[in-house]
């Protein structure tokens, strides 16, 4: 995907060696150097920009992180301020993030937990290198907790121990050394959610390479599908979903915010009125997803109301429409599901799915979807 390539590219430019085999990568690090020209382009990848803002504090010399205009409009200030509290020379200027690295003092830092869990993960990744270790205090409750739990699990695999409070509001990391390890990358529940939802809408779909015990927050799509009445069967490393008459649900998406477009389009054909809360952070994604979902569903004849932290969808019979994806991969894929149900739907900016799921349109066609790209 574009995001994976963005991360691979910037890591290579600071000295990380990545050898690709057919189904694995061998990564050799611990020899960071200043990138030629000092610039690292993170494309549209928020995770790459946020993680590298922290990692570049360990790189000797100056690094200048740049990204697409839409990504640079998204929040980064809380992470910069948290790093400054740890002694990092970092600033946000001239449409870039500039870090003068080479050493990390460490100490105690504070930041909000309700903007992006990636800020917390970024600090956890570098804290073992800090001379004084690192203590992270969150001034607001942590949202998207599962992704921080995944970070802690990953760190543990590489020999890093982190002490934390039960509510994940405080983290303590002593100075430690990463140990080489083998790490298995799970199948992505976020990408799989579209195919699983399609099964509930159109027939029967089985998705393989999914860990039913995963920590990934978007695994919650299974619970939502079951609550809506879909037939869901867990197999050996696979999930099967069968079409069913769907009913409305009320759901808190605080810890699985990326599922909003998916569950909203399911609600559009469900019997009754669904209410989704805990969605305020969805306004800070590649698009304002709350408003974008309302706009798209309204174009398809579905009654939708929005508040800052709530979306209410009344199910009906959607009609085909022209949908503006806003350049947002999750919007494009979610509305493709309704398009598959009702036909006559055009997704503008459909190429944006390459950000995380470049094979999406080919897979949709492969399972019987009537898809035509760019008039072809």
Predicted features by range, described:
Residues 1-376:
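Short, structured segments at the rim of ligand-binding sites
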């Amino acid at each position: 995907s574009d995001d994976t390539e963005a991360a691979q590219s910037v890591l290579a430019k600071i000295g990380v060696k990545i050898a690709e085999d057919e189904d694995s990568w061998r990564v050799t690090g611990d020899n960071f150097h200043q990138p030629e020209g000092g610039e690292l382009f993170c494309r549209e990848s928020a995770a790459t920009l946020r993680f590298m803002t922290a990692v570049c504090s360990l790189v000797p010399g100056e690094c200048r992180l740049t990204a697409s205009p839409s990504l640079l409009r998204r929040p980064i200030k809380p992470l910069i301020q948290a790093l400054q509290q740890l002694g990092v020379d970092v600033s946000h200027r001239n449409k870039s993030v500039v870090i003068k690295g080479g050493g990390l003092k460490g100490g105690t830092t504070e930041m909000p937990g309700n903007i992006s869990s990636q800020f917390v993960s970024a600090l956890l990744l570098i804290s073992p290198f800090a001379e004084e270790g690192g203590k992270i205090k969150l001034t607001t409750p942590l949202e998207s907790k599962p992704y921080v739990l995944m970070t802690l699990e990953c760190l543990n695999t590489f020999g890093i121990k982190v002490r934390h409070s039960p509510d994940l509001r405080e983290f303590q990391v002593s100075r430690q050394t990463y140990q080489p390890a083998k790490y298995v990358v799970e199948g992505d529940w976020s990408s799989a959610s579209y195919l699983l939802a399609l099964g509930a809408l159109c027939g029967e779909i089985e998705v393989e390479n999914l860990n039913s015990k995963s920590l990934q927050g978007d695994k919650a799509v299974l619970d939502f599908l079951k609550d809506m009445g879909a037939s869901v069967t867990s197999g050996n490393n696979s999930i099967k979903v069968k079409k069913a008459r769907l009913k409305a649900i009320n759901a808190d998406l605080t810890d699985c915010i990326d599922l909003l477009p998916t569950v909203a389009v399911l609600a559009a054909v469900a019997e009754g009125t669904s209410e989704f809360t805990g969605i305020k952070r969805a306004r800070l994604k590649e698009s304002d997803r709350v408003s974008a979902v309302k706009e798209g569903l309204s174009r398809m004849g579905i009654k939708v109301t929005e508040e800052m932290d709530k979306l209410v969808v009344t199910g009906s019979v959607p009609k085909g429409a022209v949908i503006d994806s806003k350049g947002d991969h999750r919007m494009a894929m979610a509305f493709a599901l309704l398009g598959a149900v009702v036909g006559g739907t055009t997704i503008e900016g459909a190429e944006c799915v390459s950000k995380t799921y470049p094979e999406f349109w080919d897979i949709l066609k492969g399972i019987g979807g009537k898809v035509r790209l760019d008039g072809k």
